[in-house]
């Protein structure tokens, strides 16, 4: 279902106009952010998501909806409704664990995603990193950040090993163990890109866990494990800068202390590695 209304509506207007029998049930839950909430009618639940990034064009939010509309139920929740500024998404019943699944299970899930048809838009990190620099708190801009940014821009993004649709925000809180298996939620950063970029961006605990995931994926995808790991390492500087920039970006938007702490820790990691 899609609305033709061109003006963003408030949450209460969305509920009264399109979901009159539903009431807010849970807010700020796992996998939800920026004013999104769960609405319920009796035992039936729906996730109501709001376009919460003022610096992102509306087209980015529409892409999120299109990605969910395109993906099979074996990977993601169904998209149910869209109007400018809002979408409604199927609520997945299951268990969310902050820890990642074991390497074989996660590799199978990601390989299944990467076998799907392309979304139709590419993930480009260089302009995204530049946006994070320009939109961050000016007091947080450092010569070190600028040097690293310019070095990456000079080198250019690695040549893709294999293009596929990517999720790009894989961590424990975005994986739901349902009765039918693992599913991914929170697809707002999805797009087409290198499979090694996806694997580089997974929020792993340490290099050992990362290597286990890479090896499990290589076996499933029939890719040389050493070649895949080399490609993942080529993407690593980009991913670390992406995370640092995103934390800075969210700090400027929200003022929440967790983001500044995460940004500081990521910058420390970058400085230690030179």
Curated annotation (Swiss-Prot):
Query: Which Enzyme Commission number(s) are on file for it?
Result: 2.7.1.89
Q: List this protein's GO terms for biological process.
A: thiamine diphosphate biosynthetic process; thiamine metabolic process
In terms of Pfam families, this protein maps to: APH (PF01636)
- Pathway(s) per entry: Cofactor biosynthesis; thiamine diphosphate biosynthesis; thiamine phosphate from thiamine: step 1/1
GO MF term list? ATP binding; thiamine kinase activity
InterPro entries found in the cross-reference section: Aminoglycoside_PTrfase, Kinase-like_dom_sf, Thiamine_kinase
Q: Does the keyword Metal-binding apply?
A: no
Sorted keywords for this record are:
ATP-binding, Kinase, Nucleotide-binding, Transferase
Going by the entry's taxonomy, the superkingdom of the source organism is recorded as Bacteria
**What is the reaction catalyzed?**
thiamine + ATP = thiamine phosphate + ADP + H(+)
Q: What Gene3D superfamilies is this protein classified in?
A: 3.90.1200.10
Q: SUPFAM superfamilies under this entry? A: Protein kinase-like (PK-like)
Q: Which NCBIfam families match?
A: PRK10271.1, ycfN_thiK
Its family remark reads: Belongs to the thiamine kinase family.
> Its biological function?
Catalyzes the ATP-dependent phosphorylation of thiamine to thiamine phosphate. Is involved in thiamine salvage.
User: What is the protein's given name?
Assistant: Thiamine kinase
Lineage of the source organism? Answer: Bacteria, Pseudomonadati, Pseudomonadota, Gammaproteobacteria, Enterobacterales
């Amino acid at each position: 279902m899609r609305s033709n209304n061109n003006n963003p509506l408030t949450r209460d207007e969305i509920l009264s106009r399109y979901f009159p029998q539903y009431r807010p049930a849970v807010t700020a839950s796992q996998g939800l952010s920026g004013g999104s909430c769960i609405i319920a009618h009796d035992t039936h639940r729906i996730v109501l998501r709001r376009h919460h990034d003022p610096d992102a064009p509306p087209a980015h939010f529409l892409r999120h909806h299109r990605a969910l509309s395109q993906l099979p139920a074996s990977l993601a929740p169904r998209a149910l409704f869209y109007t400018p500024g809002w979408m409604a998404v199927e609520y997945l019943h299951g268990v969310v664990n902050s820890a990642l699944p074991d390497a074989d299970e996660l590799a199978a899930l990601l390989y299944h995603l990467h076998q799907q048809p392309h979304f139709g838009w590419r993930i480009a990190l260089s302009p995204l990193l530049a946006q994070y620099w320009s939109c961050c708190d000016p007091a947080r801009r450092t010569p070190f950040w600028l040097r690293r940014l310019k070095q990456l821009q000079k080198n250019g993004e690695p040549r893709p090993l294999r293009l596929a649709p990517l999720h790009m925000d894989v961590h424990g809180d975005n994986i739901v163990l349902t009765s039918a298996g693992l599913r991914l939620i929170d697809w707002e950063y999805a797009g087409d890109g290198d499979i090694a970029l996806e694997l580089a961006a997974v929020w792993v605990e340490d290099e050992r866990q990362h290597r286990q995931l890479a090896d499990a994926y290589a076996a499933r995808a029939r890719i040389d494990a050493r070649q895949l790991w080399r490609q993942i390492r080529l993407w690593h500087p980009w991913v670390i800068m992406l995370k640092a920039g995103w934390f800075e970006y969210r700090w400027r938007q929200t003022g929440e202390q967790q983001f500044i702490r995460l940004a500081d820790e990521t910058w420390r990691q970058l400085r230690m590695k030179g």
